[in-house]
């Protein structure tokens, strides 16, 4: 908040040994004066009192990411110890806090004495060093990549600032010695270019709009690609709003209105058979980032995922409409505007094809059921919250799964061959694909505008594929499909990856299944000598009883729930791994694959 409001330009985060972290800025420094009511320093108030952040003083910050004003005090409460150093007015101050255990209870964030003047300085700013409490965070360690991703995002959103991340942890604690510096002069324009780096844009530079009115700042960048899905990422006061809100609604409305007006004014829609262009046509292949800043933020719910301020919608719509109209009517923008309208007309033709296909399906009343005959082995349970759909690779494994399942709650949908790569396909091509038609019918939610989460027939959707390259590819294709066209299934926690065992250890009547090399090594040593070892190359090698016991039985199985921690990074990863460009994919593989990894099974068997 300090640097975002222009009171500093640099924040440096350092990860140190023993899971200690330090955060330093060159802002004004936390107030050190004695609070008139509480009779302690401003530093102590900020780090020990809830709702004491600067955002509750309207003169402190014009815009703040804090909704509840609890960040500093909660960090202190959840730390074994915390040290604050303030550099202000030529002086250096310091205060220490700790969380001792007294009579079996933790006293969190207790001051160790009062704020002390410890020296003179020419610096300004605040430095906080802390160690997360291991009594709360048992085995949690700072993840460099997660922190780096968030810092990169903040740097894109605040083009004037520099964010530095240092990894000074020793090697035995996972330290790398890396330093990452994030500073982007182009702001959101650079952000969109970063997201679209592995895509083919239909015009070179993103359209970048900035405006301010009534104390609200609006910053928008957008660029269209040859892809088929829209990707809109929105933020308010640097906080991601993955569920959108009034700022997204205003942006979409402005785009539809301005693009339509331009197309009509310049007589660009000459195909009379084409239905009227709508908002989703203009947003096909669009990547956009929307960032608004305002004082009194209203979120829907406590999780800050959806902006609720009603006044933001008309304001964003007005400002984006005005600036976008000005841009499109520049002589230099003529080719860009025409490409956007041409892309939208292609989307409208596809939409018309999809609509006609849906109408045809409705006329054939039993089409959905017909799609499933001989493919889906449904379950008898009538309550979706208890029902599970296993999407199983191959007929062989599908047959074993059908025999071994719990028929009351578990349905089986075998996949024959690899499904279509949806990242390279339009929606009408996807709907022509038999595997995806069957899957859509089985889930019951519909697709696109027809999608309704309340119609979901199975609250657990479990992808079961072999642990080889083909299995990994099938998982990636299915996850791409859910991310692109049924993202709500992921965000609501319905999509899982089944984890079949890699190995079977047997000694006489004793059998153990192992899910990774480390588990195999531990159990192998416990078994001693004279055991047999089997590696499962595919699900089809397991009989129905084995598949049930290891992979489908709710009491024994291991499932990984699919989540989206960062939508922009997920978008970029999918574009890299599943898109048309092979070079970024090759670079990703070279960076992340371990080509020197030893085959542990071969080592065990052959010594």
Predicted regions and their residues:
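Conserved ATPase-coupling elements of RecA-like P-loop NTPase cores
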Residues: 5-7, 32-36, 402, 474
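Flexible beta-alpha connector loops of hexameric P-loop NTPases
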Residues: 31-37, 137, 240-246, 312, ...
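Short, glycine/charged-enriched secondary-structure capping and boundary segments
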Residues: 36-38, 305, 404-407, 476-478
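A generic structural signal for residues located within well-ordered alpha-helices
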Residues: 38-41, 70, 246, 434, ...
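Amphipathic alpha-helical segments in well-structured domains
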Residues: 39-43, 144, 475, 479
């Amino acid at each position: 908040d300090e640097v975002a409001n222009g009171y500093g330009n640099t924040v440096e985060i350092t990860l140190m040994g023993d899971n200690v972290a330090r955060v330093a800025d060159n802002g004004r420094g936390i107030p050190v004066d004695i609070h008139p009511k509480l009779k302690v320093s401003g530093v102590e108030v900020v780090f020990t009192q809830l709702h004491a952040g600067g955002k509750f003083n309207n003169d402190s910050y014009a815009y703040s990411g804090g909704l509840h004003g609890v960040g500093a005090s909660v960090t202190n409460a959840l730390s074994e110890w915390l040290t604050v150093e303030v550099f202000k007015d030529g002086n250096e101050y310091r205060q220490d806090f700790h969380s001792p255990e007294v009579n079996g209870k933790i006293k969190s964030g207790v001051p160790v004495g009062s704020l002390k003047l410890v020296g003179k300085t020419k610096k300004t700013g605040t430095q906080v060093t802390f160690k997360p409490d291991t009594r709360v965070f048992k085995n949690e360690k700072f993840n460099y990549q997660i922190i780096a991703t968030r810092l990169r995002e903040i740097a894109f959103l605040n083009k004037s600032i520099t964010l530095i991340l240092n990894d000074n942890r020793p090697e035995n604690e996972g330290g790398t010695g890396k330093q990452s510096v994030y500073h982007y002069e182009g702001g959101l324009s650079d952000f969109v270019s970063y997201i679209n780096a592995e895509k083919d844009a239909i015009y070179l530079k993103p359209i970048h709009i900035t405006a301010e009115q009534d104390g609200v700042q609006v910053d928008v960048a957008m660029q269209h690609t040859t892809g088929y899905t829209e990707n809109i990422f929105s933020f308010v006061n640097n906080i991601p709003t993955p569920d959108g809100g009034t700022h997204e609604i205003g942006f979409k409305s402005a785009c539809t209105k301005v693009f339509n007006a331009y197309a009509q004014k310049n007589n660009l829609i000459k195909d009379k058979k084409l239905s009227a262009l709508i908002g989703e046509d203009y947003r096909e292949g669009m990547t956009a980032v929307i960032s608004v800043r305002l004082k009194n933020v209203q979120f829907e719910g406590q999780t800050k995922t959806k902006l609720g301020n009603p006044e933001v919608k008309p304001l964003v719509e007005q400002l984006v409409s005005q600036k976008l109209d000005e841009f499109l009517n520049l002589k230099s923008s003529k080719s860009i505007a025409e490409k956007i309208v041409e892309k939208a007309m292609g989307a409208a033709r596809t939409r018309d094809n999809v609509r006609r296909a849906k109408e045809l399906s409705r006329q054939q009343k039993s089409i959905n059921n017909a799609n499933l005959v001989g493919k889906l082995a449904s379950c008898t349970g009538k309550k979706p919250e208890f029902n599970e759909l296993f999407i199983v690779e191959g007929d062989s494994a599908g047959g074993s799964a059908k025999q071994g399942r719990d028929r009351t709650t578990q349905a089986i949908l075998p996949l024959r061959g690899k499904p279509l790569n949806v990242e390279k396909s339009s929606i009408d091509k996807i709907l022509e694909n038999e595997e995806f038609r069957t899957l859509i019918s089985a889930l019951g939610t519909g697709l696109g505008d027809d999608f309704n989460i309340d119609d979901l027939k199975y609250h657990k959707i479990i992808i079961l594929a072999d642990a080889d390259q083909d299995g990994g590819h099938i998982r990636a294709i299915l996850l791409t499909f859910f991310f692109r066209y049924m993202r709500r299934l992921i965000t609501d926690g319905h999509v899982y990856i089944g984890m079949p065992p890699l190995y079977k250890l047997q000694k006489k009547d004793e059998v153990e299944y192992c899910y990774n090399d480390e588990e195999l090594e531990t159990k192998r040593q416990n078994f001693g000598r004279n055991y047999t070892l089997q590696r499962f190359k595919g699900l089809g090698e397991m009989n129905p009883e084995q598949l049930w016991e290891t992979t489908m039985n709710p009491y024994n199985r291991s499932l990984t729930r699919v989540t989206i921690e960062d939508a922009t990074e997920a978008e970029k990863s999918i574009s890299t791994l599943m898109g048309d460009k092979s070079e970024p994919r090759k670079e990703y593989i070279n960076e992340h694959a371990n080509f020197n990894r030893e085959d542990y099974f071969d080592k065990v068997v052959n010594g």
